[in-house]
Amino acid sequence: MLMEEIMDNPLYLYDLEYKNVIGVDEAGRGPLAGPVVAAAVILKEYTEELDEINDSKKLTEKKREKLYDIIMKNFDVAVGISTVEEIDKLNILNADFLAMRRALKDLKSLKNEKEYTVLVDGNLKIKEYIGKQLPIVKGDAKSLSIAAASIIAKVTRDRLMKDLANIYPDYSFEKHKGYGTKTHIEAIKDKGAIEGVHRKVFLRKILETEEEKTK
């Protein structure tokens, strides 16, 4: 990879401003069902293939799946998961932080937290993490490492929701991935919530809102 080609990639240039960067992002903060998944990544080698990486929300599912394999090849990757039970117990923000800490803990090339700067998507630092952190609002559109973490987290979670769809075919998890679509809410009303799959606190709020609409 020629330096002039690297200079054309603003996402990579952002990461170059810091020494030893880790990108962290999550997927699944807003759904009514399923876990929250966080990913932490460290770039091993920059290749031209990585120029296709962008914010996971702007990519098609097929494109994310393709980039997932490219990222796994070029980054050291770890994933952390917080369960529905943990989300209900801790609240979604703290469950988010827990998933992120788990991902960071499992990064094989992270030997000393103090040698790295964690670039985390959003405006908050990860609670109870001792290493240096830099929260970046809309970081998945600014940093290559955060964008890569975003894709890993999203693809991993989508796959988990498809697995749940095989177990509970009446809920169409493979389509809405646990989000509060009309189809999903109607399935919950008709068939009930699934213990350990649906988030009780989230459901209470959404069903109360739906009830208000009918008054």
Swiss-Prot record:
A divalent metal cation binds at residues 25-26, 121. Belongs to the RNase HII family. It comes from the Bacteria. It catalyses: Endonucleolytic cleavage to 5'-phosphomonoester. Endonuclease that specifically degrades the RNA of RNA-DNA hybrids. Manganese or magnesium. Binds 1 divalent metal ion per monomer in the absence of substrate. May bind a second metal ion after substrate binding. GO terms for biological process: DNA replication, removal of RNA primer; mismatch repair. PANTHER family: RIBONUCLEASE H2 SUBUNIT A (PTHR10954), RIBONUCLEASE HII (PTHR10954:SF18). Residues 19-214 form the RNase H type-2 domain. Keywords: Cytoplasm, Endonuclease, Hydrolase, Manganese, Metal-binding, Nuclease. The gene is rnhB. CDD domains: RNase_HII_bacteria_HII_like (cd07182). Its cofactor is Mn(2+); Mg(2+). InterPro entries: RNase_HII, RNase_HII/HIII, RNase_HII/HIII_dom, RNaseH-like_sf, RNaseH_sf. This is Ribonuclease HII.
